[in-house]
Amino acid sequence: SLFSLKFKGLNEMGIPTFLAADGSITSTNIQFQETVNMSNLVYEGPVDPTITGSLGNIFKWKGFTLNVFMTYSFGNVVRLDPIFSNGYSDLTAMPREFANRYLNPGDERRTNVPVIASTRQNNDISNLYVAYSAYNYSDVRVAKGDFIRMKEISLSYDFPQSVTSKLRMSGLSLKFQATNPFLIYSDNKLQGQD
């Protein structure tokens, strides 16, 4: 089972806020090791899929054979990869979500992606790193784990006997194959994350 902290939005400075165990709204008064009062946690669902399977088919026409194999999984949830860390450098690749982050006052009404905290904010707000760690493990960072994936697709051609006999071969075929070429369906929140 997956549990998350309840995200309550961004404050006027773009800092994430959460439901604390005592029922208050907070950015930094979050106890990650709480074992008694867990009323501030949200049950997201199972982490293991409840339905899994595959579907395959072979299509033949003249000398061509098309083989498709798909896998599917449904009924679970996944936590999105963390997007905030304690620091960034010029070499750090920024997540896509940062393009939609809080930049100016009022942005808290259009986005749920927090501001990248400045050095001043980190110095002025005690334990601000807690808010960003909590954001990474909040309910807004959870997606459905359902997917349908094209696992394998291949196209082969069996050359006719008239060609193979001239080459003194009993058979000749040419095959093109791709493994894991694309997802047919997954939650949009995943943005390519497996």
Task: Describe the function of each predicted region.
Residues 63-67, 162-163:
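Repeated loop/turn-to-beta-strand initiation elements of outer-membrane beta-barrel proteins
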Residues 34-43, 95, 133-141, 194:
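Extracytoplasmic loops and strand-loop junctions of Gram-negative outer membrane beta-barrel proteins
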Residues 107, 115-117, 186-194:
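Solvent-exposed, glycine/polar-rich loop segments of beta-barrel outer-membrane systems
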Residues 75-173:
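Extracytoplasmic gating/loop element in the C-terminal half of outer-membrane beta-barrel translocons
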Residues 51-57, 64, 150-155:
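Hydrophobic, lipid-facing positions within transmembrane beta-strands of outer-membrane proteins
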Residues 68, 174-176:
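Membrane-embedded beta-strand positions of outer-membrane beta-barrel proteins
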Residues 61-63, 72-76, 152, 159, ...:
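Transmembrane beta-strands of outer-membrane beta-barrel pores
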Residues 1-46, 87, 98-112:
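Conserved small-residue
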